[in-house]
From Swiss-Prot:
Protein purpose: One of the components of the core complex of photosystem II (PSII). It binds chlorophyll and helps catalyze the primary light-induced photochemical processes of PSII. PSII is a light-driven water:plastoquinone oxidoreductase, using light energy to abstract electrons from H(2)O, generating O(2) and a proton gradient subsequently used for ATP formation.
Cofactor binding comment, as recorded: Binds multiple chlorophylls and provides some of the ligands for the Ca-4Mn-5O cluster of the oxygen-evolving complex. It may also provide a ligand for a Cl- that is required for oxygen evolution. PSII binds additional chlorophylls, carotenoids and specific lipids.
Family under the similarity heading: Belongs to the PsbB/PsbC family. PsbC subfamily.
Keywords: Acetylation, Chlorophyll, Chloroplast, Chromophore, Manganese, Membrane, Metal-binding, Phosphoprotein, Photosynthesis, Photosystem II, Plastid, Thylakoid, Transmembrane, Transmembrane helix
Subunit structure: PSII is composed of 1 copy each of membrane proteins PsbA, PsbB, PsbC, PsbD, PsbE, PsbF, PsbH, PsbI, PsbJ, PsbK, PsbL, PsbM, PsbT, PsbX, PsbY, PsbZ, Psb30/Ycf12, at least 3 peripheral proteins of the oxygen-evolving complex and a large number of cofactors. It forms dimeric complexes.
Residue numbers binding [CaMn4O5] cluster: E367
Single GO biological process annotation from the record: photosynthetic electron transport in photosystem II
Keyword Acetylation in annotation: yes
Organism, scientific name: Amborella trichopoda
Record protein name field: Photosystem II CP43 reaction center protein
Amino acid sequence: MKTLYSLRRFYPVETLFNGTLALAGRDQETTGFAWWAGNARLINLSGKLLGAHVAHAGLIVFWAGAMNLFEVAHFVPEKPMYEQGLILLPHLATLGWGVGPGGEVIDTFPYFVSGVLHLISSAVLGFGGIYHALLGPETLEESFPFFGYVWKDRNKMTTILGIHLILLGVGAFLLVFKALYFGGVYDTWAPGGGDVRKITNLTLSPSVIFGYLLKSPFGGEGWIVSVDDLEDIIGGHVWLGFICILGGIWHILTKPFAWARRAFVWSGEAYLSYSLGALSIFGFIACCFVWFNNTAYPSEFYGPTGPEASQAQAFTFLVRDQRLGANVGSAQGPTGLGKYLMRSPTGEVIFGGETMRFWDLRAPWLEPLRGPNGLDLSRLKKDIQPWQERRSAEYMTHAPLGSLNSVGGVATEINAVNYVSPRSWLATSHFVLGFFLFVGHLWHAGRARAAAAGFEKGIDRDFEPVLSMTPLN
């Protein structure tokens, strides 16, 4: 393939400590990158880069399948999922597979099928990755022009963007079809403590769906993370699916406008930086979603949220002391505020004590006890159901607190338990990965902009001390 620009001009900073080492004929002299820079050597070899990406997809899908089967093999149906360190089975259960009323697992076979399907898929992807990395054409432009590309070809790049958007839209609709037609999904808000149901009455009103985007991200509002019914979640996926597919068709049929051609840097590294920036945002949003949202991430599978565990503790002791004769409506706590119940500044009746800061929690085990002005005293006295007591006691003792060595509970607790909530793991991992992706975004954006401007920040490698030293080997 004809190289459109000098690699040496664009990528002058990477150097080998030992210039004689070449790997598979792709040495630093011809690519501008040393062996350890991995796929950077394949920037202009579209066929080999395809192999690297397909092989990477194979590794991802292999992990999903293997980890899925590992979790199935270790799964004990009598214990809650969140007590067993599972992170994949809760996702499958949320999609309505293998669970019944109250989130009880009634069939693990769908989980086994999921693991096997992913393993088989990974074998296909692995073969494709090895084929394109080792045997297939180095570049696709000559033999398969539809799959070939040049990074500077703005029209081709937006066509590829369009194809990706259409695939994302199809993915959004897969969830919609599962919820509407193929067995439904798990709804933690179903009466009596959650159940799998088909979502029939979708929310398609743009004012509701896009209203989430206009909300404040702070307490009581919570931006899109505040979504608390499945009709809105599935309806939102209908909107997303249509937007992605229509946007994809638009990008395939059009060329970038002049303002876009001027505004963006059009190089492989620039596209990498845009992608890393987007993934970083996804990571931060996912972190907040799994930490605070108990509708998309039902507490039956992921364990309670932090606020939920705290409110569950207040509720559990209210139930106990009320049975022992306490008047929970008027009992005073050590601070002079209500011991069990108090009023918020806006007048709602909320739980008293330290958990007052989590007054805006909504959870399916608690909402039936609310009236028009917050918690309803008469319902608390007469209407508490056994399943609500059991669930709050369970959630009280499974707060999403814990350390890396799997010792759960409050840091000052002497009777520590071997429990860390999947919410802790998933929120922390997505925050950390989101942060690293953001750093990668800044790094590659800076390099891409510098290269486009015709200069490169970095050490002047011609006079680097290590070049005058004896090679290690």
